[in-house]
């Protein structure tokens, strides 16, 4: 009896250890996949996502150009929360090539570069109706010391092709670096995977070209997907092997003559990156009040002029009748 209990205990212990190990492995794989997705590449490799030329660095890996749009209020008051709406349009019916070569839905991501002093609004300052529109999005600062640069993604494109950032405007009364001025806002938006990794290597979401001029001797399909293309170099007689990962489709065949840099595959990329900008005015309350008082005084002056004119006309009419 004692032996049975010991055996059962050992079996349960082994089962728990295996289960925990499996969960750890799965968790590591999932989070590794997420960590290798944008915008983490930009955060790791660039101090600032916007270069001196105005180009946002995401374009270094996402080579196709696609549209993106941003909508912000024309002006905002100090210490108020407003929406910055980033639109990343694309055909939600299309599928992209995943890292394993299979087809799947597109993700989207965005980077929002705000003026100094503007930052992500705290949760307790965001109105309930705005929270409902934001959904389950998680925003983070590009750097701990760059609270004015926000990134989000990757998130499912079908659900979040329109991303709403809750932004808190600065208050010049408490923030000496903030001023009542017109400010630029920059945005970069992406849909789908990139074509180039930060180390310069290609992903499987791009065109693969021939590395040499020659004749295709053999095309071998690899067991785990992808191809090995054996090319007889016509210049020196050597054989060159070009590797194509799972995903891109071949557009060449055995016996075909090719030239260096000639495409061996189609371009599977259906996504792309775009950037845009907008302007926003940090408005002084006293200026607004002064403007309203000015308009009120103009309206009152017009009313008094009309009344005075009518009074003058009555006097003239009375004198004529007399």
Curated annotation (Swiss-Prot):
Membrane protein topology class: Single-pass membrane protein
The species this protein was found in: Anthoceros angustus (Hornwort)
Location of the protein in the cell: Plastid, Chloroplast thylakoid membrane
Signal peptide region: 1-37
Origin superkingdom: Eukaryota
Stored Pfam families: Apocytochr_F_C, Apocytochr_F_N
Name recorded for this polypeptide: Cytochrome f
A GO biological-process term: photosynthesis
The organism's taxonomic lineage, starting at the top: Eukaryota, Viridiplantae, Streptophyta, Embryophyta, Anthocerotophyta
